[in-house]
Amino acid sequence: MGASAIEFLDDESLRTAQHFENPPYDPKSVENDVTGLLIEYQNDSQNEIDRLIKESKEFSQKESSVISMKLVTDQQDRETIWKIRKGLYPTLGSLRKTGTSIITEDIAVDAENLAQAIRGLKYIFQKHE
């Protein structure tokens, strides 16, 4: 994709935006099992960035699992989105029940197995609440 950063956010992560001022989307409308990709493009050439964005839009239109795509060009909205992402662990940590821990491990999964892996992890977390 030519991205400088790609971050995967599950439904619970996306909902943490409700704890931030003026989120660029409605976190209360995030349904269960919805996920998001935060993709950042950086390049000195605006033409190259435009090309990368066009490719992403074309991909999202072909991919049946993509519900929507929002391009954020406003500097304040971009900063807010990254603030939400960077504040994810502290926010989730502050919301957890007393006596519980937050796990911050990265995992590597083939793209075709990602949805199944996430469902499996959610099942494990719910089972051991």
Q: Can you say where each PLM-predicted feature lies in the sequence?
A:
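Noncatalytic alpha-helical scaffold of FAD-dependent oxidoreductases
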Residues: 1-129
